């Protein structure tokens, strides 16, 4: 099965359930050489995060290409996955300290993203910001929140829980429409919960391999587009209870 997001999803977040447990995946693809020559780091315990880094460590820092893609609170299992560094700290704290502030973190996250807007990497075709949250403590309102921010001030959001999703079902959101000459992702599919796929994966490694393997399109101009896939299942193993697996195009020792 090809990637359900098309030949070029850009950056793609999937969230759902595997073996009755919360699960996520983050897939990275790119067209330019600098976008392709990146990798996902192992889990970095000082940061409690996984970063997308350049292969060449002497390469100049680029905030649109080099960032924390996954962040986990080791105590609660709160997980954030995003293609953009800018909103991460504020949104992560909105969820982590919601009991202290007594404010709705879903609403606050939507406001933060709306105020920032899309990434400013391209004036004509800016890249959308996509973000997913898994809050294992929020069973009542639903453990998953997902966000798509294309143009200011309009953003799109969904929320759902483990009790409303079939096992093996993954909802996804992505930066682009799936075409190599990209446009915006169809937000109507997203908000109607129609951007979803079923997986046979049983483990995070299965999920990472499945998504990475299905994204094997080779473009005549840009070549191989897939870069990396990070996947996780909250089965009690790993940081915050998340067992993590990573599939990189390039091996980094």
Say what each PLM segment does.
Residues 1-253:
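Conserved short alpha-helical segments that host acidic/polar catalytic motifs at enzyme active sites
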């Amino acid at each position: 099965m090809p990637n359900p997001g098309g030949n070029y999803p850009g950056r793609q977040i999937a969230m759902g359930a595997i073996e009755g447990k919360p699960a996520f995946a983050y897939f990275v693809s790119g067209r330019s050489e600098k976008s392709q020559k990146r990798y996902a780091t192992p889990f970095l315990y000082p940061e409690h995060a996984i970063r997308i880094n350049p292969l060449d460590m002497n390469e100049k820092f680029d905030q649109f290409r080099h960032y924390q893609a996954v962040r986990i609170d080791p105590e609660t299992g709160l997980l954030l996955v995003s293609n953009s560094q800018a909103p991460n700290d504020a949104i992560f704290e909105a969820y982590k300290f919601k009991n202290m502030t007594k404010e709705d973190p879903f609403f606050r996250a939507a406001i933060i993203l709306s105020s920032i807007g899309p990434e400013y990497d391209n004036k004509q075709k800016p890249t959308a910001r996509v973000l997913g949250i898994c809050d294992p403590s929020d069973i009542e309102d639903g453990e998953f929140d997902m966000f798509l921010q294309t143009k200011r001030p309009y953003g799109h959001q969904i929320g759902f829980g483990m009790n409303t999703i079939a096992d093996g079902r993954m909802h996804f959101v992505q930066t682009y429409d799936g075409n190599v000459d990209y446009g915006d992702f169809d937000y109507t599919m997203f908000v109607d919960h129609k951007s979803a796929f079923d997986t046979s994966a049983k483990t995070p490694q299965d999920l990472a391999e499945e998504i990475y393997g299905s994204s094997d399109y080779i473009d005549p101009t840009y070549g191989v587009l897939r870069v990396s896939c990070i996947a996780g299942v909250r089965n009690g193993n790993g940081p915050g209870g998340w067992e993590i697996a990573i599939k990189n195009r390039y091996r980094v020792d």
